Regions:
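Short, solvent-exposed loop/turn and secondary-structure capping segments
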Residues: 32-33, 49-55, 114-118, 164-169, ...
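A structural motif corresponding to the C-terminal end of an alpha-helix
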Residues: 91-102, 204-230, 267-268, 272-300
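Conserved SGNH/GDSL esterase-like catalytic core that processes O-acyl groups on lipids
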Residues: 62-200
Length: 402
């Protein structure tokens, strides 16, 4: 993804130059409808670039899958630190397509409303929060769009409103805490089912709708006419296969201890057949209810099929006999989703929050999907799925938008 990384560095340089030249009178100031076009990404970890450092999975050591190195999440102008700690806006994030300027405002853990998590990390929502120098993503978008020609906004939001992370934790805990002859499923835990009541689905759909409308307000405040920019609303991809598609048996603990995918078959089937469709339907219903001009839906539910975590069609680096992520064909033989880590990652470069997120290859696939949706500026929606094996000229997995 060399071309995409060069585009990102160009973005950093432009941001730094803008800061340096404050007060100078440009001949033609960029802004609504003026200047090079930009795509801005907003939302949560499924668009911020979470886990984008790692290409595939390995239990033999980090070096075999470390595609970006220790600066992967450093998104400030100098590429020396995170702008917001633990937002994990990686340099492989999908908005850096290589075909159009990209700017990443998304933050891992974000919900529709701004909050501070239990560990004290600030999580900007799709709102106009402003306090102590911290801002919501809608306000950040408004500021950026006023001085850049934003032609499209890509958004992923809603998963954390449904407490996706806690659900995954419950599923893995139940897998590890019960035997195969008497499995304890997470899909009937009260803490899980509470997220999928009719009342909560309605409430979260409304919250997502409100977040999307805040994006329109931000663009209006920045001087954009409705319809002069496009909103690309993406849903969520399936990260694990159905029960029959795992390459590790659910008997014993290998599924988690080796594969990092501790789900009972029954829970994996429920996740793909009920939980994911419910969340994705809420996202799409919210987009429809918001009624924002030039809204396009980018459907990703099946985008990673065949490359999902622990799927029988792929494997760990060592299971496939590869020297490392850089080996020819690695993109087609290894997983596009990061392993689930449930214990302390102290002493390693891994983060628990990277669990079950699109990795370096996954981010590249999503970037290709977004490129196809961008469509040279004639933005379109559709269903994105895997294309032919191999990589395109930008180092991304081949994808198809239909």
């Amino acid at each position: 993804m060399r071309a995409r990384r060069l585009a990102l560095l160009s973005t950093f340089a432009m941001t730094l130059a803008t800061t340096t030249l404050l007060g100078a009178a440009p001949a033609h100031a960029d802004g609504p409808g003026v200047g090079s076009p930009w795509i801005v990404s907003v939302g949560d970890s499924y668009i911020s670039g979470e886990a984008g450092r790692w290409a595939g999975n390995s239990n033999n050591g980090e070096s075999y899958i470390d595609a970006l190195g220790s600066t992967a999440y450093y998104d400030n102008a100098g590429h020396t630190a995170e702008v917001i700690n633990r937002c994990h806006r990686s340099s492989s994030a999908e908005v850096y397509t290589g075909v159009v300027n990209g700017y990443n405002l998304a933050c891992s853990g974000a919900k529709t409303s701004t909050y501070t998590d239990s560990n004290g990390y600030f999580k900007p929502g799709l709102d106009f929060y402003s306090s102590g120098g911290q801002q919501g993503q809608a306000l950040m978008l408004q500021t950026f769009a006023a001085t850049h020609n934003v032609k499209a906004i890509a958004v992923s939001i809603g998963g954390n409103n449904f407490n996706f992370g806690s659900i995954v934790q419950s599923c893995v805990s139940d897998f590890l805490g019960s035997p195969s002859w008497y499995p304890d499923y997470c899909n009937d835990d009260s803490s899980v089912t509470a997220n999928f009541t009719s009342a909560n689905i309605t409430a979260q759909t409304t919250a997502i709708k409100s977040g999307l409308l805040n994006l329109r307000t931000a663009m209006r405040n920045a001087g954009y006419a409705d319809g002069s920019w496009s909103l690309v609303v993406q849903d969520y991809m399936s990260p694990v296969p159905n029960g029959s598609g795992f390459r590790y048996s659910q008997s014993g603990y290998t599924r988690q201890s080796t594969g990092g995918c501790g789900f009972w078959d029954n829970d994996a089937n429920w996740a793909n057949g009920s939980a994911l469709p419910t969340i994705n339907t809420a996202v799409k219903n919210a987009a429809t209810q918001a009624g924002i001009a030039s809204t396009k839906v980018l459907e990703l539910a099946n985008a990673f099929n065949g490359r999902r975590l622990c799927e029988s069609t792929v494997g760990l680096i060592e299971e496939k006999g590869l020297a490392g992520w850089w080996s020819a064909g690695a993109v087609d033989q290894t997983e596009w989703v990061n392993q689930i880590r449930t214990v302390s990652t102290a002493g390693s470069d891994y983060y628990i929050q990277e669990s079950l997120h699109p990795n370096y290859w996954g981010q590249g696939a999503l970037a290709n999907c977004l490129t196809l949706a961008w469509n040279g500026g004639a933005v379109r929606g559709g269903t994105c799925t895997r294309g032919a094996n191999g990589l395109n000229s930008y180092g991304e997995p081949n994808m198809v938008l239909s």
